[in-house]
Amino acid sequence: GRDGYIAQPENXVYXX
């Protein structure tokens, strides 16, 4: 979610 689209469930949502 650091970039707002990276496919990683870091914050429960991709970015979102």
Swiss-Prot record:
It is found in: Secreted. One of its GO terms (cellular component) is extracellular region. Transmembrane segments: none annotated. Expressed by the venom gland. The keyword Secreted applies. It comes from the Eukaryota. Keywords: Ion channel impairing toxin, Neurotoxin, Secreted, Toxin, Voltage-gated sodium channel impairing toxin. Its main location: secreted. Alpha toxins bind voltage-independently at site-3 of sodium channels (Nav) and inhibit the inactivation of the activated channels, thereby blocking neuronal transmission. Has the structural arrangement of an alpha-helix connected to antiparallel beta-sheets by disulfide bonds (CS-alpha/beta). Belongs to the long (4 C-C) scorpion toxin superfamily. Sodium channel inhibitor family. Alpha subfamily. This is Alpha-toxin.
